[in-house]
Amino acid sequence: MKITDKNIAIFKKWYIKDCTVRNKDFFHFSVRNIKESRKASVIDENTVTKGEVGIYLDGSPDDCISLQPLKNMGQLYIGSASYNSYDEVVCVDDEGYVYSRSCKYDSREKKIPFGIDGPLRNIITKIKNISGRLYIVGYNNSVGYRDGVNDWQSLCLNLPVFDYSKEKGRFGDEFKLRDIDGFSYDDLYVVGGKGYVWHFSGAEWEQINFPSNIYLETVCCAGDGYVYISGQSGILFKGRGNKWEKVSAGGYSLPFEDIVWHAGKVWCTSDYGLWCLDGDTLIPVDLPSEIAVAVGHLSVGDGVMLMAGMYGAAWHDGQEWHLLFNSVEWQSDDEAED
């Protein structure tokens, strides 16, 4: 199905913050209102309207896109997984407020439980599908997973807790988890802080002896059996357990937002570009100009990779790229109207 300018005109008022693959024909995005974002201060985040947008490649021209505006939510993350034979899309904000929808429901949910035992001990920084289950990770060693509607289970277990009341003058950077991935439910990795890496083997967490104290941002448990971890400036490590090697010295302006495994390769992206690991060499991907606008975030599932930036999105089928939309020109027109 051809997505027309009329279909995607909705993105004139919104820009993308995150994306997820529901299946090879359904792509979903967390978005935020552009005009409200320009006016809001840092402490007014919840006054900016957020939203969940779905694009359906198998739909008719009149029924290929949906929008659900969401009020009173903070920084919004989005993921998708299957439960009880139907798939769902789940949006969580940094404070643990939840919106979810599937073919059976479409509603706001109870806030994710907060407390020393988790799942939430502080703010959320990521939601990710691992082996068909949605996991969340965040500050103060927050880790948990979704077990159904209004059902979040803690995986904080033996992860240490930072006591802000007793540690005045410190921010507990080493407890600020940024990402999670895994080969299975019983083989998970979380990363964050300065060289802070933990491994879960099914019973408890074990801290990994990581060979660097740089700030860590992303992790990918890849199809080649290795774990890839990136940090500040795009520095990239490869390993597993307590054996690690640096495969890229970085030197980029921004850290990677996401690392994924797709089409037999490791892919990394930031707002400044897309890179692919060729052997042990990280090389920039030469993208057509209309696709390059979509760099920023990655999601994989059902054999495809979705890439989304503030003003565009594209997907890769394992062989070639397909543009979903590019709204950069619309944004220029909109700014002129302001």
Sequence positions of predicted segments:
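Residue-level hotspots at or immediately adjacent to binding/recognition sites across diverse folds
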Residues: 1-338
